Amino acid sequence: MTYMQKLIANYKDKNLILKILVGMFLGAILGILTQKFGGGFLNGFAGFAEILGNLFVGALKAVAPVLVFILILSSIMTKKLGNATGIKYIITLYIVGTFLAACVGVAFSFLFPTTLSINDVVAADKTAPVNILVVLKDLFFKIVDNPLHAISSGNFMGILAWAVGFGIALRFCTNGTKKVFVDLSEATTKIVQFIIQLAPFGIFGLVCTSVYNTGLSTLAGYLRIVIVLVVAMAFVALVINPLIVFVTLRKNPYPLVFTCLKESGLTAFFTRSSAANIPVNLNLCRKLKLDEELYSISIPLGATINMAGAAVVISIMALAAANTLGIRPDFGTALLLCVISAIGACGASGVAGGSLLLIPLACSLFNIQNDVAMQVVAIGFIIGVIQDSVETAINSSTDVVFTAVASHKTNPKN
C-alpha cells in the first residue's frame, strides 16, 4: 500500500462528524483572519475555500435528483408495495409537525413581541406569491413537469411523480431490466457515499465564506428577531419533535432526535439546502436500518413538504411586521395564521427564496401593504446566514426523525 493509499484509508476511518467539526473550526479561523487582515495569500486561500464549498454543495445538488429518481424507481419496480400505510403515516406526521411548528412560531411571537426597523431597508426585488392558491398551483404544475427538466432543475415533486409512475409501469418488465436499475441504484449510492466523505472540505469552505462575507456586525441590529427565531426553532427540534416521537412510540425520543440533529442537521446547517441534504438523509436512514421502501420516498417528499422551520419563520416574521405597524391580532386571526403558515411552508420549496418570499402571503392576513412586507423579506435575507441555516437544519433533520417514527410504527422489527 502506497503512502497516498494509507492516507486515504486513514481519512476514511476517522469519524465523519469529528472531521466536519474540524473543518468548521478551521473555516471560521480562516474567515476571521481574512476579514481582519486580508492580504494576497489569505484572500487567495479564502477564494480557494469558497470554491471547495461551492463544489461540495454543487455536487450534492447534482447527484440528489438522479439518486432520488433511481432509488424510488428501482424500489417500486423490484419490491412489494407493502408499506402504503407507512407513507400515509409519514405524510400525517409531516402535516401535524408543520402545523405545530407554526403554532410555536405564533406563541413565541406573543410571548416575545418583536418589532423591526424597516425604514432604511431596501425592499427585496423578487416577486412573492399573491395568495395560497398560487403556491398550491405551482406545486401541482411541478408534479406534471417534463421528467428530464424535473431532474435537471431539481424539481423533486416532479421527480417523485415520474419515478413512481415509471416504477409502477416497469413492475412487470423482465428480471434483466430490473437488475439494470438495481445496479444503477447501487452505483449512485456509492457516488453519494464518496461525496459525503468530502463533506469536511465543503463545510470548511462554506464556513470560511460565510464568516468572511457576513461577520457579526451586520446581524447585530437584528439580534432580537434572530434570537426569537432560533429559540423557537430549537423548541420545535428539542420539545415538539421529541413529544411527537414519545406519544407515537412510547419510548425515550432523544437518542433518535440527537442522532438526526448531529448527522443530518449539522450538514444541512451549512449547505442551507434540503435538496442538497437528501443524500445525507438517505445515508443516515440506511445507517439506522429503516425501511428502504419507506425512506426512499419519504425523504425526498419531506424535502418538499416537511417545512417545520419555514412555518416558524413565516409566522414570526409576519407577526413582527404586524407588531411594527401597531397591529394586534386576536386569537382567531392568530390561529388562521398558523394554518396559512403551515400550508405556505409546505410550498416553500416550490418558491425561489423559500420561506422568506411567503412572508407577504402571511402579512396579507393583516392587510399589510406589499411594499412593507417586502422590506420584511429583505430583513430576512440579511439575517439569512443564521435564519436559513437553522431553518434548513430543522427541516432536514425532522425528515429523518419522522421517517424513523413511521418505520418503527409500521414495522416494529426495524
UniProtKB/Swiss-Prot annotation:
Pfam families: SDF (PF00375). The keyword Transport applies. The keyword ATP-binding does not apply. The chain crosses the membrane at residues 15-35, 56-76, 90-110, 150-170, 191-211, 225-245, 299-319, 339-359. GO terms for cellular component: plasma membrane. It is a multi-pass membrane protein. Keywords: Amino-acid transport, Cell inner membrane, Cell membrane, Membrane, Symport, Transmembrane, Transmembrane helix, Transport. GO terms for molecular function: neutral L-amino acid:sodium symporter activity. It comes from the Bacteria. GO terms for biological process: serine transport; threonine transport. It is found in: Cell inner membrane. It catalyses: L-serine(in) + Na(+)(in) = L-serine(out) + Na(+)(out); L-threonine(in) + Na(+)(in) = L-threonine(out) + Na(+)(out). InterPro entries: Na-dicarboxylate_symporter, Na:dicarbo_symporter_sf, Ser_Thr_transp_SstT. PANTHER family: PROTON/GLUTAMATE-ASPARTATE SYMPORTER, SERINE_THREONINE TRANSPORTER SSTT. Belongs to the dicarboxylate/amino acid:cation symporter (DAACS) (TC 2.A.23) family. Involved in the import of serine and threonine into the cell, with the concomitant import of sodium (symport system). This is Serine/threonine transporter SstT.
